[in-house]
Amino acid sequence: MLEQMGKAAKAASYQLAVLNTAQKDRALLTIADLLEVESATILAANVLDLADARQNGMSEALLDRLLLTQERLSAIASDVRQVCRLTDPVGQVIDGSMLDNGLKLERRRVPLGVVGVIYEARPNVTIDVASLCLKTGNAVILRGGKETYRTNAATVKVIQQALSQCDLPAAAVQAIESPDRELVNQLLKLDRYIDMLIPRGGAGLHKLCREQSTIPVITGGIGVCHIYADDSIDFDKALTVIESAKVQRPSACNSLETLLVNRSIADRFLPELSKKMAASGVTLHASSLAMPYLTSGPANVVAVEDANYNDEWLSNDLNVTLVDDLDAAVAHIREHGTQHSDAILTRSLSNAERFVREVDSSAVYVNASTRFTDGGQFGLGAEVAVSTQKLHARGPMGLEALTTYKWIGYGDDLIRA
């Protein structure tokens, strides 16, 4: 089955690669319209997925991720229309020159070809990824979580219907509808057809893909994000940033997981932190250094375990520890971070510049929340993932990250001397 899907996707990718922007945008607008027209079918499939998930004991937080409503589906359709407004990177000339040997050489953006995406219980990802791949002339094979396989199947059917209406190959967007996990292992070996694989899930999925895939893999999305509050901060402003980074959306990969506080301000700052976190319902996992300053405060406090510093909580939990200086903060981030998003709160320009130079994460912030690591917030539009590696993309992956380039040389019956 997957062999046939791969062949069909590769054939479709050749057709997509030569489409102009107007043709791709027409397909996207048709998809957006049909999502609204066929919303009842998609929502009915989602109801069945929700019922199974609830019966299997899925938490309310995860059920909410899985849930589609008419309002949410309309918002997803609106997001597809927004992709139409983004600049198409395909065909852009990155650079070019006339060489001494007479060759006019340029580097031009082109689609990757076929993208494979493995993701979990978020039905909106199906549309987000499909729309970005189509905009960049890529075919895509989707493998959503077993919790959403009915919703994904119904959604992809609508997308394929829209593609057919636009005289484009339905195989440009395909989904593996079976929840059989063995098919994931088979997908990882389709290097003959798939040019890039993107896993969007937990550490286990990323490890599986890195170890088993014969396809180039873009990993990321696992965010053990830090904020370092140095000794020059404005307490009120810093507390506002810390609170927002933790509680705005705790389940997001760019939410704050560990707070590092300069030891010299601990006796004054941590009691204020306790009040702020108590009001937001955050449990503090305090080190032995931080604990004495937090035990008398209103926040729920427990002793941190060493392993917690590597935890992506994705909940109203926050590690808190003290460091002597910037060197110690950077060392902690290097040991426990995932190169996702890390920030410093400071009024010291030299500390800010050092932090930016020395913290090797895909996004580094000065006096700003880690929550900004997002395609929409970066002005990239939607994103297919957040990459924490260095090749071939890093940070939020928008349209450009779904392209590569080719060298094109022009001559006048030119031969090499």
Curated annotation (Swiss-Prot):
It comes from the Bacteria. It catalyses: L-glutamate 5-semialdehyde + phosphate + NADP(+) = L-glutamyl 5-phosphate + NADPH + H(+). This is Gamma-glutamyl phosphate reductase. InterPro entries: Ald_DH/histidinol_DH (IPR016161), Ald_DH_C (IPR016163), Ald_DH_N (IPR016162), Aldehyde_DH_dom (IPR015590), G-glutamylP_reductase_CS (IPR020593), Glu-5-SA_DH (IPR012134), GPR_dom (IPR000965). The keyword Plastid does not apply. Its EC number is 1.2.1.41. Pathway: Amino-acid biosynthesis; L-proline biosynthesis; L-glutamate 5-semialdehyde from L-glutamate: step 2/2. The gene is proA. It is found in: Cytoplasm. GO terms for cellular component: cytoplasm. Coiled coil: none annotated.
